[in-house]
Every structure is written in C-alpha cells, then in structure tokens.
Amino acid sequence: MTSASANLAHNLAATAQAQPHARAVILDDLVLTYDEVEHSARQLAGWMRAQGVGEGDRVALMLPNVPAFPVLYYAALRLGAVVVPMNPLFKRREIQFYLEDSGASLLAAMPGEDAAAAAGATGTRLLTVGPEGLSSYVHGDDAVDPVEEVVPRDGDDTAVILYTSGTTGRPKGAELTCDNLQSNQLATTETLLHLDSSDVVMGCLPLFHVFGMTCGMNTAFATGAALTMIPRFDPAKALEVIERDRVTVFEGVPTMYGAMLAAAGAAATPPDLSTLRTAISGGASLPLEVMKRFEETFGATILEGYGLSETSPVASFNHPDAERKAGSIGTPIRGVQMRLVGPDGAEVGASSEDDPQVGEICIRGENIMKGYWNRPDATAEAIDGDGWFHSGDLARRDEDGYYVIVDRKKDMIIRGGLNVYPREIEELLYEHPAVAEAAVVGVPHPELGEEVAAYVVLAPDAQADEAELVRHVKEQVAPYKYPRTVTVIDELPKGATGKILKRELRGDGA
C-alpha cells in the first residue's frame, strides 16, 4: 500500500509538527530543533529536485556524524529517493565503486580530492558539505522552492542501500525497504528502548552504519528524543558528552565499552553518568567481564542484541521486560523468527549441558532485506525459498529460547579436525586482569590445518608475557583449544564501527 506514512521522512515531519521547539540534534554547542531540521530537509529536498533527483534515484551520503547527515538523509527520503550511506574515510577507488555500483546521481561529502575525483569519473553530481554546513542551500544563494509534502512510498520500496563490509569479496548492497526500517525502528523503540521525547540518545555509532542509523537516528527522530552526536568516537569525549547532555541511552559496540572503562579509570574526576539508564551492545559479542565491569562502574544496564545489515539490523535482544541472560543475544524481537540449522539444512534443537547443539542462525520476518542490489544470485544464496536469511553466524539456543553466539561460521577454527570457537578463548583472556582487548584467530599449520593464535592489547600500566597468558588459558580448556601463541600488540585492527577485523590478523584478506 502506497502512503506518505510508509516513507521514513514522515517520522521527522510528524515529530516536527508535534514538538517543533524540542531539541533534535546536538553537536557540542550547536543545537537544532525539530522544526529547524524539518525546514532544512524541505529546502534540501527542493535543491535535490532542482538537480533532477526523483523517486527511486540513489543519493550517496559520505559524511561523519554531523547535523548535515540527518538533514540530507530525510531530504532524500522526502523526495522518494534511495539513500546510499558511505564511510567518510573511503578513498577514491572505494568511492568510485560505490557510485558506479549503486548508480548514484548525487554524492554529498565533506571537501576532499578523492570525493571530487570519484564523482567526476562517474558523472555523479557532488554536493560539498563545508564548515558552514548546508546553510547556503537552506538560506543562501543556492536555496530553491522547498518540497512541502512527503512523497508517498510503498512499504516494499527500497529506502536505503546499505553495503556490507565486503569481508568475503567486494561489498554487496543490501536493499532495505521502507517497511524493513519502519518495523525495525518501531520494535526497537517500543519494546527495547522504551524511548520518548524526554530521552537523549548518544549518537557515537556511525550513522552510515545500520546500527547507528536505525537504533540511534531513526528511533530518536520517530519519538522526539534528542540525538547528541560525536563525529568520531573518542572514549573520553563520550563520557564528557554523556555527563554534559544528560544522556539516557547509549548504544555501542564491545570495543567502545572497554575503551570507556579505561577512560573513566584514567579520569582525574569520576564522570557523573547518573542519567544513563540503558546501554545496548551489538555488532559483535560483548565479553562478559567487560559487561560486568561497565555495569558496576556506571550503574546502567547493558542489553545485548544481535543483527546484521541485511536484517535492518535488529533480529534479537535481551528484552528489558523479560529475564536477561548475560552473554546471550536474547530472543527474537517482535515480527521476527529465528532458528538454527545444521550443515545438512535440518533444524537444530535446544542445547543442554549434556547435549550442546550448534547451528547457523537463520532469520525470517519484517526486517529481512529485499535482496542484494543487482545481485540475484547472491540474494538467492542468502535467502532461501521459504524466506529464511542465512546469517553465517553460529549459535546455540537454550530451552528458554535464548540464543548464544558461538562464533562466525568463517571464524571457527578447525584444529586437527576439532572445532575451536574463538569467542570461548577470548572470554578467558578477558578474565586476565592485564588484558584490555583480545582476538583469537586460526593460522595455517602444515599438519593440523589450523593452529590457534591470540592477539591481545594490555591494559594501561599492566604487564604480562606470552607464557603467562598461554598458561592462563591452557589451565582452563581442553588441550586442543588453548592458543600456542599470544602476541601482545599496541592496537587491534578495527573497522569504522569499532568491530575487530580478524581478517587482518589472519592476513588472508578473507
């Protein structure tokens, strides 16, 4: 059914009408109200329309977390265009691939030679977002007639093309529909975060990533909560902003939680985070030791969940009104089904201590992408004939229906024919007081196929040698599981969202 309300731009319009003077976006001393963001989005939509952008056209946004991002995001959606978020750290080759693959007609980016060169090479119009933001397009010489009405969209129309990280080849664009994103933000808002207009959401997750886009920006703008931004995550800055803006909801990936703990420990004065009521973690498994220390230090409850770009992203969560099981990713959210399947495709049952059952997570529901942009074969491989999306993640399910991630299918180590799940070993390393971060990977071995190797970052002023860390794990697991090497490094390689890039540790580029 085609309607204006299916279009995500309706959320901003409705909130601006209901509470025009409420804070929408905060970036240090800059505060924009919902009326100001809505006015700017109408003006920018008019400018885009004057450049020939229309319904179904792709608009690429290559911006950090700055107020221009939500303005341009909702402006493009208002026209019925499709948003293509991009990492602002991309170089020319990466930018050019995204523009060519998506067929974007417009690229919005910060000033830079790479963006200009890629736009020129692909014939893509470039909108440069300078230090003054978008003022010239809203109030100045470039301003044109605004788009007053939200273009009606069908629920199955593509709203966003979100490219996967490309860990197994070139990135693929997941087509997320209006219904995908609306249902996911509604379920997140109403059943997980319980957001309302009194809340302040911390926007330090990149808005070009589905976690920050849906759980941060879309939920805030649909409920009238304020979104306070950090252009690039810095743990000390995050603590400062939580205290200054009285943040109530923090959303992060596991490495952010560890970094904030370290920053709090190094601060001359303990930060006042008393307003923080809920923190949510996703993107990777949160070490239990980090969860415990964060909650003890800051007094906020962490709810761990699970999702992917292809699932808009939230698929399951530890629901706040149900039992929380630390270390689990909870149960499926409203409108979503999950199950586990084995290598033969048969469904895997519940696990018990005597009978552990591991299978690949498969997901079906309102959150599943339409498909991969212009890649029907990849779509057919990922989504089976019954509508189940195959995630590539391994998990077990307990008798209460709670799922526990075991590992990425591709990250599982097969040592001499025996399966080793890196997360189990990482959890043990995190229990050592000297370890701040840990990652375990499989490395080639001429006889065993793969050997277990660990990389760790030590906590500030901590000391531990390889033998001590190997012994710490060896004493607690079967002989085939413990790492034969533990390498201490200054920093683990991470992606834009803070997720640890194990492929770089393996050195295989996979």
Predicted feature residues:
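Conserved ATP/PPi-binding loop(s) of AMP-dependent carboxylate-activating enzymes
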Residues: 331-335, 346-382, 420
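Conserved pre-ATP/AMP-binding loop-to-beta segment of ANL
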Residues: 5, 21, 144-163, 170, ...
